[in-house]
Curated annotation (Swiss-Prot):
PANTHER family: CHLOROPLAST PROTEIN-TRANSPORTING ATPASE, SECA INNER MEMBRANE COMPONENT OF SEC PROTEIN SECRETION SYSTEM
Gene Ontology BP term (one): protein targeting
CDD domains tied to this protein: DEXDc_SecA (cd17928), SF2_C_secA (cd18803)
Protein name: Protein translocase subunit SecA
Gene: secA
Top-level taxon: Bacteria
Species this chain originates from: Gluconobacter oxydans (strain 621H)
EC number: 7.4.2.8
Annotated Zn(2+) binding sites: C905, C907, C916, H917
Lineage, top ranks: Bacteria, Pseudomonadati, Pseudomonadota, Alphaproteobacteria, Acetobacterales
């Protein structure tokens, strides 16, 4: 009550924020006549003028009115679109590092150009982040015309680009791309071996389109770069055969749909043990014996695959592969795989080829990636429902931007039925009724399965319609273009919710593009375009009179934002429209989360088959259920962030140290320091402090010095000398080690040794970091059990992660020291037969292997150089026969400096440099 009274008297916080921005709008509008009087060349020169003024000390805020006026005029001339006043406010919100909530059809893409242009003037780059590759390409293509007119460059990051193309795109003033591509490029850059090979510049400003989808919906899913692990496909198949039998029996597992978890009952544990033993999968002993721990893991993942994941809802099988379906967009997520063996369990369930498991090499969550940007802003049609999360996690305020024209859409109360069959029958009845009026209809479903079920009903009734889901995603553009035509019926999964604009009468641009594809004659193209424009304008009037787009939702989603996205397809830019949701007691949201009393109360009302209940009370009850789900998901994301923050600080430290090593030409000082630390640790481990020589473990120390430092020293004789202590031993060992290193450097030459030192440090750093990530994954999976011992899992995780990180650094020092002490030059490669090998081109990055929350392929591990010890014995690799005369030392050193490791060797052997003469470096 008091809150409502305060809002009435003083306005909401959003109102006060808008007023502050609205005061600047007249200032921008006042500049319009003068800017319109400028020639194209004078308008373009304004960009140069703004840059010069920035260099002299002016601020971006100071330039804002003029820059916005220039961008607005350029847009009017080049794109034929002039920014409305409310769009100017949206641009100011984005520039301020906030989130602009703008209704569908209000021109978010155009709004972004204002903030993008202003912030690109600094020359530090602006990243515009979209949810898929199609939107990245489309927006970059459409808006590059504007930016080019203003003298700015535009790049776009999409899959399958080379490093050179990526570097060029990031060097542009404005770079478009998806959240996945930006994130993976960051991880890949931090796996490179030279600063020159990195593609990204230091971060400056990111503007995230559909910010709620990327920063909220996908926040819990980490980006992971991975390499191959052990193959256990046979075990997955054997366990799957057992679980198929198991799930058909009663009382063998407990399933919690709220938490999406499943556990074996005591009876189930005994039963699975019997089935595994019969199948010959279980080794001696019980299921939970230590040597069967891998089998337990496989059983758990197979059980999840069979009980929690449904084909055509959570994933589809396409071309013999299991492809994940994004629960928020309904789109296929090609290249992404579930981690921790779950994807392999699904492949076994569907009897397709089981891909190899992978091991994490590098990972980061979107939460931590986007917090790397000094300035972050975003835009979406639905953000206010998650305003608290944006503020708490990202320190971003949400500002609701008013529409340019009032919203005329009529939102009808939900209709709730007893069963799903009754619900879909009622939906079909309404579709038939509305279709006869000529009003276009968009029907939203939550899965492929349900969209095809409704399509089957409409087909039986002879009602023409289009289906848009992950199976028909190739036809998306043309289906969406026609969705606003008179009488059009479109059944869509959530994929129609984002990045699409359904215009009444049809989308002229999309229809023209589809109709003129392959037509080269300009006159013919113009004729086709004129005909389409005339038809669409006629259809627009017809649909407008019929009542606009009618949106029908067949189920409430867990998130109110997804429902609002669907509603928002209708009533764009002041158009008329309607929306209505049809629900049943069998819907997941009501069945799992809504009050149990709802079903009982409806049944007590004595509803007959086919009857529905419509009441605002039901809407409120459903909204409460959605809020509970959203709060639960928020808590889960916060919890994920707390754990990831532990590694995030370590990741920043590791990547910063690694970049420092890459930027340093001479690492001999670092090598010497690591060696000194290693020697001190060795001596202190074998010589107790302030002890007599008799208590020294000289034999153990001698063996370790020989193993790690490759030195045979008379340490036992030193111990007999008067006055000898641990410090004296350290000094002597260090002197001998330094002498040996100097001899190796003299033998190989200082320049070559510097290259080898850098290679050793970076490859060792990567190896120990990879092993640390694997250990951290294992720790994270089991840390929750500490709660049963009355200990805080998060604190336990922090303590153990710190201990593991310290141990990782110690391990790195020992490995680098051991490798450098055993390095030796090889005059020429051994004479193995020439083997024909395929090359992937001169790119160091493993392309196409990246996924969210899992991996999609193999990454070859860095190959050790000649004479290097490796963590595990490796079979000898085929080596080339040198062709022609061997290069001289000067040529070799030039090759080492200029030739990428994965490029073909300049000697002409046909092998990669790293497998040929690059073996020496």
């Amino acid at each position: 009550m008091f809150a409502r009274l305060a809002r009435a008297l003083f306005g909401s916080a959003n109102d006060r924020t808008l007023k502050a921005y609205q005061r600047r709008v007249p200032e921008i509008n006042a500049l319009e006549p003068a800017v319109q009087a400028l020639s194209d060349e004078q308008l373009r020169h304004k960009t140069t003028e703004f840059k010069e003024r920035l260099e002299k000390g002016e601020t971006l805020d100071g330039l804002l009115p003029e820059a916005f006026a220039v961008c607005r005029e350029a847009s009017r001339r080049v794109l034929g679109k002039r920014h409305f006043d409310v769009q100017l406010i949206g641009g100011m919100v984005l520039h301020a590092g906030r989130i602009a909530e703008m209704r569908t059809g209000e021109g978010k893409t155009l709004v972004a150009t204002l903030a993008v242009y202003l912030n690109a003037l600094s020359g530090k780059g602006v990243h515009v982040v979209t949810v898929n590759d199609y939107l990245a390409r489309r927006d970059a293509e459409e808006m590059s015309i504007l930016y080019s007119f203003l003298g700015l460059t535009t790049g776009v990051i999409v899959p399958n680009l080379s490093d050179g193309e990526r570097r060029e795109a990031y060097a542009a003033d404005i770079t478009y791309g998806t959240n996945n591509e930006f994130g993976f490029d960051y991880l890949r850059d931090n796996m490179k071996y030279s600063l020159a090979d990195m593609v990204q510049r230091p971060f400056n400003h990111a503007i995230v389109d559909e910010v709620d989808s990327i920063l909220i919906d996908e926040a819990r899913t980490p980006l992971i770069i991975s390499g191959p692990a052990d193959d256990s496909s046979d075990l997955y198949r054997s366990v799957d055969d057992v679980v198929v039998k198991l799930v058909q029996e009663p009382d063998v597992y407990d399933k919690d749909e709220k938490l999406r978890s499943v556990t074996l009952t005591e009876h189930g544990s005994h039963r699975v043990e019997e089935l595994l033993a019969e199948a010959g999968v279980l080794q001696d002993g019980g299921l939970y014996d230590i040597h069967n721990v891998a089998v337990v893991h496989h059983v758990q993942q197979s059980l999840r695959a069979h009980t929690l994941f449904t084909r055509d809802v959570d994933y589809i099988v396409r071309d013999g592969k299991v492809v994940i379906i994004d629960e928020f967009t309904g789109r296929m997520m090609d290249g992404r795989r579930y981690s921790d063996g779950l994807h392999q369990a699904l492949e076994a369930k569907e009897h397709v080829e089981i891909q190899q498991e992978n091991q994490t090499l590098a990972s980061i969550t979107f939460q931590n990636y986007f917090r790397l940007y000094p300035k972050l802003s975003g835009m979406t049609g639905t953000a206010m429902t998650e305003a608290d999360e944006f503020a708490e996690i990202y320190h971003l305020d949400v500002v609701e931007i008013p529409t340019n024209l009032p919203v005329r859409r009529i939102d009808t109360d939900d209709e709730v039925y007893l069963t799903a069959a009754e619900k879909f029958s009622a939906v079909a009845d309404l579709i038939k009724e509305i279709h006869e009026t000529g009003q276009p209809i968009l029907v939203g479903t939550t899965s492929i399965e349900k969209s095809e079920y409704l399509s089957h009903i409409l087909t039986q009734r002879g009602i023409p319609h289009n289906v848009l889901n992950a199976r028909q995603h190739e036809k998306e553009a043309i289906i969406v273009a026609q969705a606003g035509a008179p009488g059009a019926i479109t059944i869509a999964t959530n994929m129609a919710g984002r990045g699409t604009d359904i215009k009444l009468g049809g989308n002229i641009e999309m229809l023209v593009k589809a109709s003129t594809e392959g037509v080269e004659d300009e006159a013919q193209r113009e004729s086709v375009e004129q005909n389409i424009r005339a038809i669409v304008e006629e259809h627009h009037e017809e649909v407008h009179k019929a009542g606009g787009l009618y949106v029908i939702g067949t189920e409430r989603h867990e998130s109110r934002r997804v429902d609002n996205q669907l509603r928002g397809r209708s009533g764009r830019q002041g158009d008329p429209g309607n929306s209505r949701f049809f629900l049943s007691l069998e819907d997941d949201l009501i069945r799992i989360f809504a009050s149990d009393r709802m079903g009982a109360m409806m049944q007590k009302m004595g509803l007959k088959e086919g009857e529905a209940i419509v009441h605002p009370w039901l809407n409120k009850a459903l909204e409460k259920a959605q809020k509970r789900v959203e709060a639960r998901n928020f808590d889960m994301r916060k919890n994920t962030l707390k754990y990831d923050d532990v590694m995030n600080d370590q990741r920043k430290e590791v990547y910063a140290q690694r970049r420092e090593y890459m930027a340093t030409d001479d690492l001999s000082g670092v090598i010497a320091e690591l060696r000194e630390h290693t020697i001190e640790d060795l001596v202190h481990a074998h010589i107790p402090e302030k002890s007599f020589a008799e208590a020294w473990d000289t034999e153990g120390l001698t063996k370790e010095v020989s193993r790690i430092l490759n030195l045979d020293l008379p340490i036992a004789d030193w111990a007999k000398e008067d006055g000898m202590d641990s410090e004296g031993v350290i000094e002597r060992i260090e002197a001998e080690a330094a002498k040996a290193q100097a001899a190796r450097t003299a033998n190989m030459g200082p320049e070559l040794m510097r290259l080898i030192e850098k290679q050793v440090v970076l490859t060792t750093f990567d190896a120990v970091w990879k092993e640390y990530l694997h250990g951290l994954d294992q720790l994270r999976q089991g840390i929750g059990l500490r709660a049963y011992g009355q200990r805080d899992p998060l604190n336990e995780y922090k303590q153990e992660a710190f201990q593991m990180f310290t141990a990782m650094l110690d391990d790195m020092r020992i490995r680098v020291t051991e490798t450098m002490c055993r390095i030796q030059a090889v005059s020429e490669p051994p004479p193995f037969p020439v083997i024909n090998t395929e090359t992937s081109g001169p790119s160091e990055e493993p392309a196409g292997l990246f996924s969210q929350g899992t991996t999609g392929g193999d990454i070859p591990a860095p190959q050790p150089m000649a004479g290097f010890p490796s963590a595990a014995p490796m079979p000898p690799r085929p080596q080339p026969v040198p062709t022609g005369a061997e290069p001289d030392a000067a040529t070799l050193q030039r090759w080492y400096a200029e030739t990428p490791r994965n490029a073909l060797c300049p000697c002409g052997s046909g092998l990669k440099f790293k497998h040929c003469h690059g073996r020496l470096a």
